Amino acid sequence: MPLLTIVPPMPGAERRFKPFVDFVHRAGWETEFVRLEWNGDQPNFDSTALFSQVDLQTAGKVVLGYSLGALYAHLGALRARHLILGSISPFFLEDDDEPQRWMISYRAGNAHTPADILVGAKEDEQMHRRATAVRDFYRQHTYTNVLGAEHELWHPNYLKAVATALDRVKARSAKPAA
């Protein structure tokens, strides 16, 4: 079975993500979580240590991040084979409407990594603005505006969008090299 590496958004996510992990297993994928050393209160806008931890554990892998996990994956999984970024949190340098944020541009990711960008159709304007900018950053991407969904990974349409992305990655991996 192919492997999906999940970047947790906060400490304790493995427990909270159990229903999502079960869903991914039913879709024919194994899962693992990136193991992060959390320092201080989260999110810790004064530290970029998580990004290098993500990079060390995601090289060559299919990586999913949701919310803050998507931000960590975008800035950290620089050598991933494929990214699935769900409802990426708007805490980048460019998000000047956020008083607390990382002073790192969303352009610090790897534009050459294939990426699926997802955002709930009912999420606020700021979330859509950031998702669109991240979408446009990646040279090879798909973009899904998940109908009926707010900021909720468990929404049936969000799960369907993730399954579609996983199927696309699996199909691409199965194609013989030309």
Which residues are covered by each model-predicted region?
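Gly/Ala-rich beta-loop-alpha elbow adjacent to hydrolase catalytic centers
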Residues: L64-G69, A73
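The feature captures the conserved acid-bearing segment of alpha/beta-hydrolase catalytic domains
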Residues: E94-F137
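Histidine-bearing beta->alpha loop at or near hydrolase active sites
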Residues: W38-N39, V146-L153
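Alpha/beta-hydrolase active-site loop
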Residues: D41-Q57
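Residue in the alpha/beta-hydrolase core beta-strand immediately N-terminal to the catalytic nucleophile
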Residues: K61-V62, H82-I84
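Post-His helix in hydrolase/transferase enzymes
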Residues: W154-L166
